[in-house]
Amino acid sequence: MAKIIGIDLGTTNSCVSIMEGNTTRVIENSEGARTTPSIVAYQEDGEVLVGASAKRQAVTNPKNTLYAIKRLIGRKFEEKEVQKDIDLMPYTIAKADNGDAWVEVRGKKIAPQQVSADILRKMKKTAEDYLGEPVTEAVITVPAYFNDAQRQATKDAGRIAGLDVKRIINEPTAAALAFGLDKQDKADRKIAVYDLGGGTFDISIIEIADVDGEKQFEVLSTNGDTFLGGEDFDQRIIDYIIAEFKKEQGVDLGKDVLALQRLKEAAEKAKIELSNSAQTDINLPYITADASGPKHLNIKLTRAKLESLVDELVERTIAPCRLAIKDAGISVSDINDVILVGGMTRMPKVQEKVKAFFGKEPRKDVNPDEAVAVGAAIQGQVLSGDRKDVLLLDVTPLSLGIETMGGVMTKMITKNTTIPTKFAQTFSTAEDNQPAVTIKVFQGEREIASGNKLLGEFNLEGIPPAARGTPQIEVSFDIDANGILHVGAKDKGTGKENKITIKANSGLSEDEIQKMVKDAELNAAEDKKKVELAQARNQGEAMVHSVKKSLGEHGASLDAGEKEKIEAAIKDLEEALKGEDKASIEEKTNTLMTASQKLGEKMYADAQAAAGAAGGPGAAAGPEAASAPADDNVVDAEVKEVKKG
């Protein structure tokens, strides 16, 4: 029987795996590598290069070499994330007739599904070369937070590549399969899969249980950001190099497509090197030229500098983790294991942040580049019937419902519901003799339908004349195991029905998803902001009071310059305290803390001298005395943290 292969279709790299008996095998490609760059190049003579060969010629053919195409799949051209990428990518992103984001290569518009299909074709061929037989069936992975449009588009890419996609499976769930299958522990375990890849971020909370000898993998919750990944980290490095080079040479490399492609390659290399070393040299001779001749680029990049450049990106992964824990109805301490997936999790800063949040060391026995493909292969074996001891229970990431009277969103299926699932509810007409009803399908967490994303709509016509509230219209929602939605409406009186499958051209952007969730919990988030601002203001005011008091007592013995610096810092902080900018208050507080260090040293020296004169050890003030808030009239208050949406 032909094998069902497992494919991790990644933003940066892709990987293919199969099951041999009960053992998984990641298959090497024709270049001998276990992962293949998700890069496709279109040559002048019509040849299509995929993987390492496409990557090698990218510098000389930037306009026709496509990478990170997964960031565009199933998205609209007008989406904010797509618009952001237009300025960053050396290739052209174009608007398709249906409003989708496509790419333009050699004067021809191509859908992201077609480009992804070229990558999938390479993975298919890799498996066929190893097995010595044709491969027609596959399980393909997607980020857990991919919406309906993105899942449909991925499935279409598989079909274009000549594959019957037996299942679309979530990447963190696949990684959990790879991790949990060989564990002999019979006790139930709750694991967090933190998946930071090339273009997307997912967090899933999964419970692994042993039920009568069968391993059950149940996803309790999932969250994420489908526009956050290694590509964004690379871009921070590229922006930094461009700024430094402009400062030194007066030339803007951002406008040079060839230079940008070289910078992209160098940034990725530097990022990888800095996971294992404290600094690296970025050396690009002949990067550009002007009237004075060729220009060479040589910049030292330290790990500390890289971490400061990407700190905000790493921090952005924590809010989804908090939400996932909350939605799973557990606390962080209930997590037994933390699994890291995706190449970006090799960065020490990421590992530190994960450890700090979960309070435990992440597991190191899972290969972050291969676990997802391995899990997909295991699921393939389950679907083929060759494996009976695994049960996988995944979830839908957002609530689904219809608009009812008064514009209300009536939720049919709530977020984090285990799939596949079906739900039906009976509705009626709002007016007398109403001949038809329009079923509008929405996705999101807001109570008012218009605040959510309209996925699609259809009519049920031919309703016999009757008083309002009399006709019985049954609306049914059906989410299949791929997370794809089918909606139907049926008049129970006449038996007439109509159905719709949500099409890929009605996708939902990650930005919209996050906005919906955030809007639904807006009040909680606003409260948290107010508390944080109050805390920052209290700390700032205490600092001003403390330093002013110390300055009055010991300022006379300071240099005039030092004293002026402290007074200026006090003035700046007092000005910031009048406003509402928490970051500015914190920054000015830290500036005053630094400026007052000399004052602290002076106080310490004065105290030592006084103690010496008194002939005893004395109780000297520490060097931080000036920086510590005075304890006059300090009231300890317990503030309950409101979880941020």
Swiss-Prot record:
Residues 608-645 are annotated as: Disordered. It comes from the Bacteria. InterPro entries: ATPase_NBD, Chaperone_DnaK, Heat_shock_70_CS, HSP70_C_sf, HSP70_peptide-bd_sf, Hsp_70_fam. Induction: By stress conditions e.g. heat shock. The modification Phosphothreonine is found at residue 200. Residues 620-632 have a biased composition (Low complexity). The keyword Iron-sulfur does not apply. GO terms for molecular function: ATP binding; ATP-dependent protein folding chaperone; unfolded protein binding. Gene3D superfamilies: 1.20.1270.10, 3.30.420.40, Actin, Chain A, domain 4, Substrate Binding Domain Of DNAk, Chain A, domain 1. Keywords: ATP-binding, Chaperone, Nucleotide-binding, Phosphoprotein, Stress response. PANTHER family: HEAT SHOCK PROTEIN 70KDA. Acts as a chaperone. Belongs to the heat shock protein 70 family. This is Chaperone protein DnaK. It comes from Variovorax paradoxus (strain S110). The lineage of its organism: Bacteria, Pseudomonadati, Pseudomonadota, Betaproteobacteria, Burkholderiales.
